[in-house]
Amino acid sequence: MESGARPIGSSCSSPAALSREYKLVMLGAGGVGKSAMTMQFISHRFPEDHDPTIEDAYKIRIRIDDEPANLDILDTAGQAEFTAMRDQYMRAGEGFIICYSITDRRSFHEVREFKQLIYRVRRTDDTPVVLVGNKSDLKQLRQVSKEEGLSLAREFSCPFFETSAAYRYYIDDVFHALVREIRKKEKELVLAMEKKAKPKNSVWKRLKSPFRRKKDSVT
């Protein structure tokens, strides 16, 4: 993976800069490790001390399945309340990573609130989502089983990962999976539009075919 992280607003004249940009949004209760996951993905480092996030944005250029991708990642605060700013980035976001901590059952219950928030703003259940149970290295403090996470992911029809931001377990997989989900949805949309655009048989063609079959049966 390229470590080409660059600050917001910087310019880049390389051809890869013109590749597809994916707007990803991190959601989840406070303290579940959203910022640590993002920083591990962007810069391969784990922040030992980190102030609670208000809102941070990161950009990185990578390749996923041999296709270039410019990721624009928004790391949000840990509240599910509706605000005008949240409405704005929920509409602009193309895919969402909803995180909870396996050591905090309350954060797991709040996952549904964030999923409902996505629906409330976008009015569709078809938005690409990846569900993440973070802090998998703290097994002795586990409050949420892996089976519960898998069950909720099946309900959401989305990929699921248990991660460790501290040890960088499955961090890349989460972001790559979300980009794949976005690409899959885009391909499905293109196919649906192409199918809709195909010319249908005329009324006369549909009327003639039973007559033709009847005539053939008589002869």
Curated annotation (Swiss-Prot):
Positions contributing to GTP binding: 28-35, 75-79, 134-137
GO BP term (any one): Ras protein signal transduction
Ranges annotated as spanning the membrane: none
UniProt keywords, alphabetically: Cell membrane, GTP-binding, Hydrolase, Membrane, Nucleotide-binding
Domain of life: Eukaryota
Cellular compartment(s): Cell membrane
Keyword Kinase part of the UniProt annotation: no
Tissue and organ expression note: Expressed in many tissues.
EC number per UniProt: 3.6.5.2
UniProt cross-references to Pfam families, sorted A to Z: Ras
UniProt note on regulation of activity: Alternates between an inactive form bound to GDP and an active form bound to GTP.
Keyword match Hydrolase: yes
Gene Ontology CC terms, in alphabetical order: plasma membrane
GO MF annotation terms: G protein activity; GTP binding
Reaction it catalyzes: GTP + H2O = GDP + phosphate + H(+)
Major subcellular location class: membrane
CDD domains: Rit_Rin_Ric (cd04141)
Family statement drawn from the similarity comment of this UniProt entry: Belongs to the small GTPase superfamily. Ras family.
PANTHER family found in the cross-reference section: RAS, DI-RAS, AND RHEB FAMILY MEMBERS OF SMALL GTPASE SUPERFAMILY
UniProt miscellaneous comment: Stimulation of the NGF and EGF receptor signaling pathways results in rapid and prolonged activation.
Function summary: Plays a crucial role in coupling NGF stimulation to the activation of both EPHB2 and MAPK14 signaling pathways and in NGF-dependent neuronal differentiation. Involved in ELK1 transactivation through the Ras-MAPK signaling cascade that mediates a wide variety of cellular functions, including cell proliferation, survival, and differentiation.
Assembly, per entry: Interacts with AFDN, the C-terminal domain of RALGDS and RLF, but not with RIN1 and PIK3CA. RLF binds exclusively to the active GTP-bound form. Strongly interacts with BRAF, but only weakly with RAF1. BARF and RAF1 association is dependent upon the GTP-bound state. Interacts with RGL3.
Name of the featured protein: GTP-binding protein Rit1
Gene name, Swiss-Prot/TrEMBL: Rit1
